[in-house]
């Protein structure tokens, strides 16, 4: 089934020799590229070699079975054959997953954009709780976070926020968070005890590199203005806030979180590049209906993906029909279990398509 992987093993061994060659190491750019290729192949090669060892051991055990003349040894061989057959089946499934086409964005940093939706002040409070949840999850993963821009709303609420998350595999873990998140609870201001429903929209964008997106200066309109705080009052006496409009697409990015205009412009450009990259990917995906079906949900940000029900203390992800009854822990960043299940579901759907 995996015979063509022998050539992958040969390539891996060849790479091992190359990355240890002093002449190759001297060319840092080429060496880094080869090291990445080596690291990408290593999990597949290790699993394949383990799989081949198990196949060889199984064949040897089957040849021995019935020839030892020792009943105790025969029973041991039967047990070992059963264990090896189970392991080989597991190896095959793991190899299939390792051979699935990789998302080229998986290892990238991300921008998480959270916007309050329907529900007024409650929606703003919920958007703030989602921001905190992703910050705490990132801390647990030893990733770094940086607020690129934030617009506050009401008391402690957020109208809109853009946060950058830097860390290995950030996009691979957070990409399933895109969509509409719904909260059901009794607001503190609700005297009758009636449950209100509010929403917040989350968009997760991979950080675009210069090679991904080329932006012509003539396509940009850059406006500067004084940063405003909660309620619209000016919080800065200089024109430090920056608004960048990409004229061909109409995309607008505003950044006023820093006191420096230069820093705000730099942050705004990073976000703009990622939004343009996301737009380009979206256009490509319009021609890939089958690929869209293989994703968890549709990837549409208008899709309701998850409900946070406070009275029942539960979180339900509607894409995989999974419910967790540890709401506060979840909001404190313990979302790994849900992400693992979403990843497994996504892989299973892609395997179905391959088969």
From Swiss-Prot:
It comes from the Bacteria. Signal peptide: none annotated. GO terms for cellular component: cytoplasm. The modification N5-methylglutamine is found at residue 233. Keywords: Cytoplasm, Methylation, Protein biosynthesis. Belongs to the prokaryotic/mitochondrial release factor family. Peptide chain release factor 1 directs the termination of translation in response to the peptide chain termination codons UAG and UAA. This is Peptide chain release factor 1. It comes from Finegoldia magna (strain ATCC 29328 / DSM 20472 / WAL 2508) (Peptostreptococcus magnus). The lineage of its organism: Bacteria, Bacillati, Bacillota, Tissierellia, Tissierellales.
